[in-house]
Amino acid sequence: MTLSTLPLSYCSNVHPGLTVDEVMSGLTEFTLPVREQVGELAAGLWLAQPVIKELLTTDGRLDQFASFLQDHGLTTYTLNAFPYGNFHDARVKENVYLPDWTRDSRVQYTLDCARVLARLLPPEIEWGSLSTVPLGFKEFEHPVDFQDQCAQRLIDLAQSLSRLRDETGRTIRLAIEPEPFCVLETTDETLDFFQRLRKLAADRNLLDEVYDLIGVCYDVCHQAVEFEDVADSLRGLQAAEIAINKVHISCAIRVENPSTNEEARRVLATYAEPRYLHQTMGRSADGTIHRLVDLTKEAALNPDADFAAADEWRIHFHVPVNAESLGPLQTTRPDLKTALETVKTLADCPHLEVETYTWEVLPGAEKPSLIDGLAEEIRATRRLLNNL
């Protein structure tokens, strides 16, 4: 049992790009200079739906893009197929979960991503991965059979991925990414859904395809925000034979003793921003979890009674993974260390990707340049992995 020996990946969703030219420009401007600093590096690509469409419908465009990656020595073995549209819009928030997994557009986009990755995947790499939305956003209205509808679409996708393997010889696996306030957010919810998914797959004689091609993307930040024991969570997924196809190396914000820690709450208020959703959880001494769908300045500065009484808050804000603290704020880096220690013991050998997409919205004038910040994240992650 060991960790993946593939080059460490970092996710390009930190860079905007709604055309192929814009994606290549981001890779040239940021990814290549980061690689110059850190050495071998994989590009975990976020390719929005317009980019995927351009690659598949413009003659020669996909071959041109593949040549660009090869010419620049950039390895790609994973795509982030979670954000469908503009992940750098002025306001993304809950729209990032659209379309959900009942929609034809989500299925088609994901399959198109698989077709692109099958072309980009280097021949020496056995399989590629796609991370995706955890069905949908829990706060939206859904029909009573929503999870069954999603399951049927995922089974359809597994069948299509199996056919793609027959056509191309390339194996592409899906990685469903649980996230706070989504239909799948906790490990228990994920375990329950996979039972449902597999029962329906068996009814369609597609159980083998689902076992092989549908797994999870374990985002350490997300499960830490839920106050889960990440080691137990990972072992529970393995015990249920749910493949961990991808791990997002990520950290969240922690506030200890928030009722008396006014300085931390003042600093936390500066992290409330209009683009991304920052789901917030507070845990009381008796283990009760209090939930807030999005961090606001008011919630940080003047929390309600339940949150004020909590011993600790955790906030879904991806912060640099090399940071143990951010001034008076703490991070969930200890959970990241525990998660990677556990991953090393598992039978699965998931793809490993650093995913800190929030550099543009991080507060503070003293933060490093994006290139230097990403490079330090990669170096810190390598040190962490090497010391396991």
Predicted ranges, named:
Residues 287-388:
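Flexible, acidic glycine-rich loops studded with aromatic residues
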